[in-house]
Curated annotation (Swiss-Prot):
UniProt-recorded name of the protein: Glycine cleavage system H protein
Biological-process GO terms, alphabetical: glycine decarboxylation via glycine cleavage system
Residues where N6-lipoyllysine is found: K60
Organism from which the protein derives: Paramagnetospirillum magneticum (strain ATCC 700264 / AMB-1)
Gene that specifies this protein: gcvH
GO cellular component, one term: glycine cleavage complex
Cofactor(s) in the UniProt record: (R)-lipoate
Assembly, per entry: The glycine cleavage system is composed of four proteins: P, T, L and H.
Family per record: Belongs to the GcvH family.
Lipoyl-binding domain: residues covered: 19-101
UniProt keyword annotation of Acyltransferase present: no
The protein's role, per its UniProt record: The glycine cleavage system catalyzes the degradation of glycine. The H protein shuttles the methylamine group of glycine from the P protein to the T protein.
Keywords: Lipoyl
Amino acid sequence: MSSKRFTKDHEWIEVDGDVGTVGISDYAQHALGDVVFVEVPEPGRVVAKGAEAAVVESVKAASEVYSPVSGTVTAGNQAIVDQPGLVNEAAEGAAWFFKLTLSNPGEVADLMDQAAYDAYLKTLE
């Protein structure tokens, strides 16, 4: 069972201690289509829960990636900047967008687990 938590905007976060890894869901990458550009935040940037933290562009649309929790960015994934198509191949794995140190770990509890997210996706069909 995945320890990922999801937002209604289709971001995911996986938390290890006080560090979270953030990306977009497989549903989101599928909806976007072929990803052609990614912008990730710089380390040291402070982001608030729900605030724009990254950008993903596809042949169909440009979309913001929002931070699911508040914290300080510790790393951006240069691999997806160099090869945006990785987002389509491994959205919920190697194609994470950024890592951050959580400033309020309690915010994670407000997010959906995999089962709740799957149920939410069914309401969008």
